[in-house]
Swiss-Prot record:
<dbReference type="InterPro" id="IPR022801">
    <property type="entry name" value="Ribosomal_uS4"/>
</dbReference>
<dbReference type="InterPro" id="IPR018079">
    <property type="entry name" value="Ribosomal_uS4_CS"/>
</dbReference>
<comment type="subunit">
    <text>Part of the 30S ribosomal subunit. Contacts protein S5. The interaction surface between S4 and S5 is involved in control of translational fidelity.</text>
</comment>
<dbReference type="InterPro" id="IPR002942">
    <property type="entry name" value="S4_RNA-bd"/>
</dbReference>
<comment type="similarity">
    <text>Belongs to the universal ribosomal protein uS4 family.</text>
</comment>
<dbReference type="InterPro" id="IPR001912">
    <property type="entry name" value="Ribosomal_uS4_N"/>
</dbReference>
<dbReference type="GO" id="GO:0003735">
    <property type="term" value="F:structural constituent of ribosome"/>
</dbReference>
<keyword id="KW-0687">Ribonucleoprotein</keyword>
<dbReference type="Pfam" id="PF01479">
    <property type="entry name" value="S4"/>
</dbReference>
<keyword id="KW-0699">rRNA-binding</keyword>
<dbReference type="InterPro" id="IPR005709">
    <property type="entry name" value="Ribosomal_uS4_bac-type"/>
</dbReference>
<feature type="domain" description="S4 RNA-binding">
    <location>
        <begin position="92"/>
        <end position="155"/>
    </location>
</feature>
<comment type="function">
    <text>With S5 and S12 plays an important role in translational accuracy.</text>
</comment>
<keyword id="KW-0689">Ribosomal protein</keyword>
<comment type="function">
    <text>One of the primary rRNA binding proteins, it binds directly to 16S rRNA where it nucleates assembly of the body of the 30S subunit.</text>
</comment>
<dbReference type="GO" id="GO:0019843">
    <property type="term" value="F:rRNA binding"/>
</dbReference>
<dbReference type="GO" id="GO:0042274">
    <property type="term" value="P:ribosomal small subunit biogenesis"/>
</dbReference>
Length: 200
């Protein structure tokens, strides 16, 4: 299944979550797109709620269904709560870490930076967005890429880095200190609904 490439603004409004991370999609019209706009009152079934939650998280991380399901299955083989393990695995993806460090303004930008070879892990170039970052590993920007406008501007406006990460803006180097806790990850996601969706 191909990655979704349609309007993120419409998709954000339909799902009720900012897929870009900027929140701009919901500022003027915080309701689903369509003819009836804010007057839509369609009640979702249990399956519909589960599907919507799955789609929210999948589109948030910009993953194909196969990538998303594979990560979900890997999380199920780990000790602990399946849903929480899943959220932690997603947050440990290289593109997610690059975004959380503030090197990109959106997750899509972060994925592109990785794809184009601008990001190093422990000093070695890694161009796989799904690469799973491990605690104590360092993430940095390739020297030739450090003056890219997208990176410079992102770092300038970013004023928050999660506690499970360390970041030095001068050297554009971050450290994945530890695995994140569930409370440090997107609160607008109910991962239990996703577990129920795949358990049907």
């Amino acid at each position: 299944m191909a990655r979704f490439r349609g309007s993120n603004w419409k998709k954000s409004r339909r799902l009720g979550i900012s897929l870009s991370g900027t929140g701009k999609e919901l500022e003027k019209r915080p309701y689903a797109p369509g003819q009836h706009g804010p007057n839509q009152r369609k009640k979702l079934s249990e399956y519909g709620l589960q599907l919507r939650e799955k789609q929210k998280l999948r589109y948030l991380y910009g993953m194909t269904e196969r990538q998303f399901r594979n990560t979900f299955d890997i999380a199920g083989k780990k000790f602990g709560v399946h849903g929480e393990n899943f959220m932690i695995l997603l947050a440990s993806r290289l593109d997610a870490v690059v975004y959380s460090l503030g090197l990109a303004r959106t997750r899509r930008q972060a994925r592109q930076l990785v794809n184009h070879g601008h990001i190093l892990v422990d000093g070695k170039r890694v161009d796989i967005p799904s690469y799973s970052v491990k605690p104590s590993q360092t993430i940095s920007v390739r020297e030739k890429s450090q003056k890219l406008n997208v990176i410079v501007e992102s770092v300038e406006i970013n004023n928050f880095v999660p506690e499970y990460l360390n970041f030095d803006a001068d050297s554009l180097t971050g450290t994945f200190v530890r695995l994140p806790e569930r409370s440090e990850l997107p609160a607008e996601i109910n991962e239990q609904l996703i577990v129920e969706y795949y358990s049907r």
